[in-house]
Amino acid sequence: MIRFDNVSVTYRGGVKALRDIDLTIEDGEFVVVVGLSGAGKSTLLRALNGLVPATEGSIDFNGTEVVGASASELRKIRSDIGMIFQTFNLSLRTTVLNNVLMGRLSFVSAWRSTFGLWPAADREMAMQALERVGIVDKAYIRASDLSGGQQQRVGIARALAQEPKVMLADEPVAALDPITSRQVMGDLRRINQDLGITTLVNLHFLDLAREYGRRLIGLRDGALVYDGDIADVDDDTFTEIYGRAITEEDLMAGVELAGHGPDETSDG
């Protein structure tokens, strides 16, 4: 279980990124977080794994306090959290399999990973992760040869190889075309359903949030302004969260109608 208790984050210069967040996420939930740019979505995820320190309040991660945690405690917390990034964060010059094996770093000695002497069990786990996202046939090619959607699937497989209790996806489809975005969101939803991994996804496109989410969290100016079941969400809900009317730019359907997206190449 994850619990935020009166959590605030203030950056240098006095910018308050999170304001008095009270939030509980149960094991196995699939939660979508929405809000305008600067609303605090990324800060919420980064505060959970200790990348951004909370300046007030407490964060409980499966019984361990994140705020003020020691270096060893933070390493343990982060080993239980798989991160998926908007920019993929892959090593493009090496193979897809080697990228996924990076998710096993906390389980092997430094010399083994340095020389690529991964245990057979770790290699098998990495291949299973690639199988789960549908690109096991790409295991031995360079990551640079993949499309954007395929690279994001490698990122998901790498997080999955970590055997996480929680997966955090920060705008995972922001750089992808509409078809590929739905494929990636489908992968995340299926992993959550099949493996019961608690999943938090930051999204910009509100129709994707409605299509794939089960619970919706809305942030505005660092404050929690909505928390409820996705079945109860309508356009008025999003207007309330954003503090303005919804535009085509807020919808994946708007991108489709415009006839283009950030990543023109769909990878099937």
PLM feature spans:
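Conserved catalytic motifs of ABC-family nucleotide-binding domains
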Residues: E163
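Conserved ABC ATPase "signature" region
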Residues: E65, V108, R112-D137
